[in-house]
Amino acid sequence: MSKSARLRTVWWTLHRWIGIGLAILLVPIAVSGALLVWHDHLDALIHPGRYAVSGGAFVPPSAYVASAATAIGAGVQPAAVRFPESDGWPVIVMARGARVEGGPPPRIVNVYLDPPTARVLDVVDFRSSLIGFLHRFHENLTIPEYSGRAIVGWAGVGMLILSLTGIWLWWPRSGAFLPGLRWGRAAHTTTNLHHLIGFWISIPLAVVSFTGIYLGFPQTARDVMSSIAPMTPQGQRPGFGSIARDARQTPDSALDAALASQPGTRAAAIFLPTASANTSERDRARGGEGAREQNPRASGPVWRVQLRKAPTSEIVTVMVDDRSGAVERQRDPLAGDRAAQWMRWIHEGSHSGPVWQFVVFLTGVCPLVFAVTGVIMWWRGRRLRRSVAGNRAIGSGGLQAAE
């Protein structure tokens, strides 16, 4: 056997057994990712009442906060107001329960509101909803306490190996490229499907798998990224501290101040001020921890307001000081932060246009096709090998009888 033939056998064995062994894990992870590409549209299809808006006009954000607070009752607090990117979609107020040290993640409740009237359309516990379940399953198999995120990351490693070895195995042994694109390379439809679909989706699948690995091991990925590009020091996640109870500004005044500082923009989201995360948020706005030393009096709650530029819909983030009303635009992300952001966007299919979004959707659907056709190919080959072995045994027995 030649060296190339031996190498092909190694890749084939690796490809076959990783595919068969991990199919039960890879397929649901991939399909859940495909569904999440258009999660809002899927949710609207299943729950049309949540999206039954009466128009595209807006009322002051304080009306949405007040309406949501009445609907959710005690135990959770409004934390953010998200405005739709286009007409026909609801305003969503995100409310959070209290965070318990060492306990489960805080409860998250989304309140869907009619933009022109602030009328409550629906109140949804995010983690118990279908979309919330898909998010949790795709991220950590709903078992974060059992290293679910790392398991998903290693599944991504398996998918990356499958996509790369698949390219090698697809390549015609003659070395000619174009003959490999023919439908009739094999006698069976399942084999032709596996080969042809596998070739066209292999590179996008490798890209989505690689970005999924990055997201599956966040701390390791951050360590690697920060070693090659500058990143903002880690701090508390913006907007996830305790909501300030004594805020001087209102959602209306904070939004007005932010809009006045950035002409030509419109509201995307308002995050209510937090009592414990303000320092890290100020540092993030000013580009580092040194800002704290330069302005030690810069303390107290801050409002984080996201605005959309027209016509690109690019997001601009500004901080509004709750005490003084001063507005400060958040600096552009550092190179490492921007690269990490793009890793997530590429994986999600967001911020990249409808073509890539559709391609990402296909990378979630195709593993199901590969699993079905691959198992059929393996089973067919297994039966063929048994048949050949049986015929050899019969032939050997006949020769012995003749002797």
Predicted regions and their residues:
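Conserved histidines in hydrophobic membrane contexts and catalytic metal-binding motifs
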Residues: 1-403
